[in-house]
Amino acid sequence: MLSLSRLLCGTVTAGDALRYERRSADLPPHLLHFSQDKRPVVVWNVTRRCKLHCMHCYASAGDRAYEGELTTAEALGVIDDLADFGVPVVLFSGGEPLMRPDLFTLSRHVRDCGLRAVLSTNGTLITPEVACEVREQGFSYVGVSLDGLAEIHDKFRGKQGAFADSIAGIRACREAGVRVGVRFTITRRNQHELPAVLRLLEEEDVPRFCMYHLAYSGRGRKIAADALGPEETRRALDLLSDQVLDWHRQGIEKEVLTVDNHADAAYLYLRIKREQPERAEEVLRLLRWNGGNSSGMGVGCIDNLGEVHPDQFSWHLSLGNIRERPFSAIWQDLSIPLLGSLRGRRELIHGRCASCGFFDICNGNLRARAEAATGDLWAPDPACYLTDEEIRLPEALEV
């Protein structure tokens, strides 16, 4: 996760993170990705059930019951373990997490244990009453998925009227005083909608926007051919960055992030190096602290059946099950080959990634996407859009 707005506009500095000694337990949410101890943010797919049928859903969720999902007692035990382990954030996802009957029991326990609870939702089930419950039952932030305006969004979601319901959910959150943001997964099918979605943020006074690059997981694997090419990705990043700077000049406060393509960090650095050279060294320091892709380190996933994965896009790769061992024990067990390999990935990744001058701020990008595209977990990520000239050492990191 890369904060374009804070890095481009200079609203975060190295000193901000150092004041908290870069400890996950002490850092405020916007500085967590600069932590030194890298306690994992846990994406918890508490159910796989969902009333929509999104074409890019990494969980391949559907509107049916899934046998074997964790019981309330088991889930509360997971939360106790995560709290003891010092996990800073639990991100409730799905499926549609609001379809789990005990969701608010779980979120309340997360809050009572001193952790931050975040909700990832399609927004269609958020009525004014539900929004008030979200606020009262422990959630500090709600991310609502939008893939464009009505026609495009409804096609992506497989349901007519989904856009209207999601917008109603966003408005209900705002009216209830819940911090809410938009999550937009960009592909060739909806890249033309990006300007309109950014205008919508202004119209609806939504303070946060996350642009996700397509991960080839679940149903997303079937539309991998719709992932943006290098020039399309660069245009999207330029458009988004220009909008961030324009909002900043106007005094409009929006937090804008990109997710799941860590080449964005290098592309952002190169722009700052050209346009704000006096800030380049500090931005590079922050990007190195961020460290790029954190699968198996600073992010982990627990699925609806209790399987632990390196991230939410790697459901085919299990590290263990919380019904057999606590998450904390699994996460610290470097005898698990995959876990050790991900944390020592620099020695395993090959191709142009291996010699990239930006490896320490990208960390080889998204391994799940590389494996889906090539069958090799350690191959270069095909979503990297940097040129050979841009990644060449040592010129890449000259300031």
Which residues are covered by each model-predicted region?
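Short, small/polar residue-rich loop motifs at catalytic or cofactor-binding pockets
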Residues: 293-296
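N-terminal pre-core extensions flanking Radical SAM catalytic domains
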Residues: 1-61, 80-83, 327
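C-terminal accessory region of radical SAM enzymes
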Residues: 231-282, 307-363
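Short Fe-S-cluster ligation motifs
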Residues: 79-94, 341, 379-399
